[in-house]
């Protein structure tokens, strides 16, 4: 199972939110590029970067920081947040992003999803952000009536290989992931990267046992609840 540290960028800083609420912002580091280098030095082979400003505004905002991260690191970089058109997808791949994560666009713009899949294949990941079994979009500010499991099935049928599944009610809480919801999503047969609430090496072991392809770890790393090197040794 691949362990993926998360870097959330807001106002050019590395921050964490709780339950996706922009009012809960905590700044952990002033420079996201230094943070990416730090995780790589500790052994990260892949880093999850979210443009929170982009997710909120509906277009990529922190492209320059993402470019700097790519130039500074050899680790694979996956990027989400505000990716709503072909130009942004093409731009991100052209500067060296390994995976692009489509959230709102995967739901509301099927043509864009199909464009990304036909041009970039498995490097296109869909982010399913769920609250009480229903999908939320636009930086989690809007809730839809779409069921997370139905969306996962639909994505698999379209040709999506990997989904990042986040339970919003768990994100940033350090209460452990929503294992039940993850179990259901795994039943669809897509590769699942778990995100939200991961707070211990025990959580990671359980996710691995369940068959998760990867785990995105955020707040637990930044406050020292999980030691990244120790986690890599165990998982």
Curated annotation (Swiss-Prot):
It comes from the Bacteria. One of its GO terms (biological process) is L-histidine biosynthetic process. The lineage of its organism: Bacteria, Bacillati, Bacillota, Clostridia, Thermoanaerobacterales. This is 1-(5-phosphoribosyl)-5-[(5-phosphoribosylamino)methylideneamino] imidazole-4-carboxamide isomerase. CDD domains: HisA. The active site is at 8 (proton acceptor), 129 (proton donor). Its EC number is 5.3.1.16. Keywords: Amino-acid biosynthesis, Cytoplasm, Histidine biosynthesis, Isomerase. It comes from Thermoanaerobacter sp. (strain X514).
């Amino acid at each position: 199972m691949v362990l993926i540290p998360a870097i959330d960028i807001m106002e050019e800083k590395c921050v964490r939110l709780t339950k996706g609420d922009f009012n809960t912002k905590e700044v952990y580091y002033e420079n996201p590029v230094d943070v990416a280098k730090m995780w790589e030095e500790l052994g990260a082979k892949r880093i999850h970067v979210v443009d929170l400003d982009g997710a909120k505004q509906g277009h990529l905002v922190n492209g320059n920081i993402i470019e700097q991260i790519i130039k500074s690191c050899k680790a694979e970089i996956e990027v989400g947040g505000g990716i709503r058109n072909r130009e942004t997808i093409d731009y991100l791949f052209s500067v060296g992003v390994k995976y692009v994560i489509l959230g709102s666009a995967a739901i509301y713009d099927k043509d864009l999803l199909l464009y990304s899949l036909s041009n970039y294949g498995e490097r296109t990941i869909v982010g399913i952000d769920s609250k009480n079994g229903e999908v939320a979009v636009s930086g989690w500010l809007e809730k839809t009536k779409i069921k997370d499991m139905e969306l996962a099935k639909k994505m698999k049928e379209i040709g999506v290989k990997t989904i990042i599944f986040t339970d919003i009610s768990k994100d940033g809480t350090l209460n452990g992931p929503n294992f039940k919801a993850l179990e259901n999503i795994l039943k669809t047969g897509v590769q699942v990267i778990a995100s939200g609430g991961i707070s211990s090496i025990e959580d990671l072991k359980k996710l691995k046992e369940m068959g998760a392809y990867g785990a995105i770890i955020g707040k637990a790393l930044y406050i020292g609840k999980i030691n990244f090197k120790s986690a890599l040794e165990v998982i």
